[in-house]
């Protein structure tokens, strides 16, 4: 591990695994840039204007090669950045090294402890005598830390009853910070202009806060941009799920019976990926609309408890809690593969397995012996499998998502007075712009409306072409 100290603050300049990996990281970043036309177009468009000059961004998002391209785009557009990963297993160490080598503050390494994770999240918020004024979040941990910490400043008892290992580490990190600075969280929170949120789970947290009138600053829901959710969540998972399962286990997927739990965009992509390699795919759903969609796609829609003993590969994709319980786990067949592609690690009741015999096969692959004598293969300890056991989504699809992130950061930072403490989405014309920026790369050519055709369907020749309520 490499720690470099900053001259301005007690917070280190960066913490990474190995700075010698920076050349390797830089080579992969250069390749990724050729696959990320949206971000590169924004660099060209805004290079001289620097619309993020003065922005001080605290970023909490998987520290991958693709994220490195995002970070350097933000910096090119004028921002100062401090970055941490939003998952203990998702960092690509060579990507972190390449960013650190550019003098950018990054606190990320693959295989962090929970204590390190929350320490690093604190580091991106601690700018010494200065303050961050923007948050770029994935899962809502940076935003949530500020809110919970602010509550603890007034009433420390909110930290009295942690319910799991993650909360123990989180609560301890807040208590430690408050011992040295009793107003840290409220001071930082008061300087935040807004947050842009990347993923479904984090967006759900923001809407909960809005419903409670507890959102401390404006937020842009990047996840529900069409060019994010219908591309990253669907097409990204369609490629990265099977990539991670194959890298982790080397099993033949064809002929296996797989259960995908959740048939939202992530579940749809996951089911397609498994079917594409010849798996017999079943789907579990709570939503009758999604269940009907799954049935119309030819998947058997089942209940977990009815099929648990017959499934070879379990994939959770719900964003919910305790989707696979201890009762389900102990009934699984020998050598069943269990993994999660939702954001957090609580979809599978991993904690209930801690008293059984674990055999680590390789990083993020564990053999667990059940009371029945059967063994299951747990991937990434129930955390995001595609980033724990592989390298996440391909660069091209992440360019869609991250182009939305940059546009959202520019919008909030420059027009903060136009936004109340609510959750917003980017307007349709920006969604369409993001899509346009990616068409040339794949050789797609748009048909152009005539003026008469545009008038006939009551749209502009240049778009937007769909209503805000259109479901793609």
Swiss-Prot record:
Note on cofactor: Binds 1 NAD(+) per subunit.
Entry keyword set:
Cytoplasm, Hydrolase, NAD, One-carbon metabolism
Which Pfam families did the record assign? AdoHcyase, AdoHcyase_NAD
Name the coenzymes or cofactors required.
NAD(+)
Question: GO: which molecular function terms?
Answer: adenosylhomocysteinase activity
Main location per UniProt? cytoplasm
**A GO biological process held by the record:** S-adenosylmethionine cycle
Q: In which pathway does it act?
A: Amino-acid biosynthesis; L-homocysteine biosynthesis; L-homocysteine from S-adenosyl-L-homocysteine: step 1/1
- Binding of substrate occurs at 64, 138, 198, 228, 232
Q: What's the catalysed reaction?
A: S-adenosyl-L-homocysteine + H2O = L-homocysteine + adenosine
**EC number(s) of the enzyme?**
3.13.2.1
Superkingdom of the organism of origin: Bacteria
- The first-level EC class reads hydrolase
Name where it's found.
Cytoplasm
**UniProt GO cellular component terms:** cytosol
Primary role: May play a key role in the regulation of the intracellular concentration of adenosylhomocysteine.
Q: Which PANTHER family match?
A: ADENOSYLHOMOCYSTEINASE
Entries under HAMAP family matching the protein: AdoHcyase
Similarity section: Belongs to the adenosylhomocysteinase family.
- What this protein is called in its record is Adenosylhomocysteinase
Q: In which organism is this protein found?
A: Prochlorococcus marinus (strain MIT 9301)
